[in-house]
């Protein structure tokens, strides 16, 4: 998400009647998957990364592995897309607001049928659970992410498609599904504070919004750099994780990158879960911050092209991505079985229509085809559906929609595969 938006009229009235969501059949057309690593990058459209000289690794990787070249994020802001990747729905949430932690008295947006938005402002997000109706996704967003008079509207999906609200949306994620069948998952969050994720909305890796500071504040805390952001850790918004009644689906599933049980230690030991959700910090994911130095400054302009980007921010994220992929390739789990790395950007740069919400998505598998350049129409729902199929899980919410395709061509097991086991991409 970028800066708060000015309020304009809603376009939801143009949408069709409600759809119906929940859990469906196990998707077919995907080989069995032992491990999946999803790496989430931020806020850059397809055309801003592809061909960008400041993203040499991502561009080489997209050619050496497999690439979805007709892949679309769903909506805005960031949290909405993160929820759609792991849960197949926005769950009535179209804001980056923090969770209403451990709130057992509030009513979910699913239950009330109301939509949590930035404009008009909404309270913190009630813990998601139960069933109900999610929010529709119009083709054009005239409200949440309109920040300048020169940007009267931004596109959702391709600027043409819309998604009606879905009744019987179930408030759960792929994490709930995995834990329910005895499989493991973890959300690896760079710069998560040592106190863990409970109640933490923002952190710099040590200090956070729940730190009990002394008075006066120590100098190093005068301007907290929000490197970790809960809006990039979607599992925290669900009651099942906040309550933690199942230890396999709780705060213990969240770890940082460094230290005991962190990402790099787990990769080195080979002790990784079936599903790893990996979120670099807000400098390394190319989101940017306003107080973390020039290399992490926000892009000066958002026009849908490479004009106006912060080249240092793009390069910083590209280096971070390279290091993550190398670490996964070096892990014992990459040597055996069927594993996949998926790199994607959550949404575009909020440039005005007619720029669309197209983003680059890279799929790297250790068991099958490589070099595939797919032009099939895919979305965040396609990705969830594909991963669920690979794990033998039923599709969830909008991942079950009839027009959502499984990414079979990018996950195919047959055909020649180059040996990328030593992490040679971009070296």
Label each region the model flagged:
Residues 9-18:
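Bacterial N-terminal signal peptides
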Residues 1-9:
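Bacterial N-terminal signal peptides that target proteins for export
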Residues 21-427:
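N-terminal pro-sequences and low-complexity stem/linker regions of secreted or lumenal proteins
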